Amino acid sequence: NAPLTWVLPAVEEVVMGNPNTTPTLIYEGLRYPQALLGDHQRVNSACAIATLQVLQDQGWKISDEAIVQGLSQVRWPGRLQKGQWQGHELLIDGAHNTDAARSLRAFIDRTYPDEPITWLMGLLETKDHQGVLRTVLRQGDHLHLIPLPGHVSADPEALAAIAQTID
């Protein structure tokens, strides 16, 4: 007898003109800036709103303004985090499984279509190395493998052997 809420992704409001503006999302009448990058965040933010609306229905005092403010200020370091280093654009992402790698690759394909990507990557020993590498790597990409300090890291040479089998 548990209630079920089916959540559809938030809709991106398309604004013609400056492509560098932060996208605005709309879900259940709430308009809010997409603070986290990636199309998958349309689903994640909609789930957060749906959860908060259930709490509102149960009497919690959470205003729509507070929801919008919270969504506009959310940060997730290491998840599609843009930066600069010595004049080079960086994208830092801790994609640690195939689903996260799929979201990362979708963002890369949308943001940098047809551009070769230089990857600096390390993986934990316990992760699906072949699944992650097969998901993110494309023909023409460059891969630099490193151990992850302070963790049980996969051997970079073993990862390189896997990467060499990917078409």
Model-based region annotation:
Residues 1, 15-24, 89-91, 98, ...:
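C-terminal helical cap/extension that packs against the catalytic core
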Residues 7-9, 83, 146:
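Conserved beta-strand termini and adjacent loop/short-helix elements that scaffold enzyme active sites
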Residues 1-43:
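Internal gly/pro-rich beta-alpha loop/helix module
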Residues 28-142:
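Nucleotide phosphate-binding/pyrophosphate-handling subdomain across enzymes
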